[in-house]
Amino acid sequence: MRKEKLITLNDRGNEMTFKIREMPAMKLESWLARAGLLLAGTGAFDGKEVATPGDAIQKAGAMLSQGGISALANIDYEKAQPLLDDLLACCSRVDAGIEQKMTPETVDGIIEDVRTLFALRKEALLLNMGFFMGGESSVIPSDGTPSPEQSKPRISVRSRR
């Protein structure tokens, strides 16, 4: 069974629940290989031994789990966009028990705050790459009553395996 977790985000005063689901193994391997090739093209692995494609995948996973999405900062956006879209595809909005898949085409009709989009991609990355670093979440538990002065979306997590 794929790992998944439910998170609640405050999107400009609206509490929204999202389900983050782990990518299937083959898709994740492909994602890591593409990320590894893009990172290698930026010189990110210079000075680090990469003898096999598996080494590139391991190094890419380690870089992404340590640096998060910022590890992709030196990659042209057009090349990184499919990777970001794949992370978004791991996310669904859950409302009254109904899941709505997040896609580049639907996201603007669901969320308003770009920080919510960043938080979703970050949590999808953590869920998928967490095994490289032990899978510790960086989310802030929500007590269900966010204050209006909060500058960042608040997140609460419920995990199921």
List the predicted regions and their residue ranges.
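Generic structural motif
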Residues: 10-12, 23-25
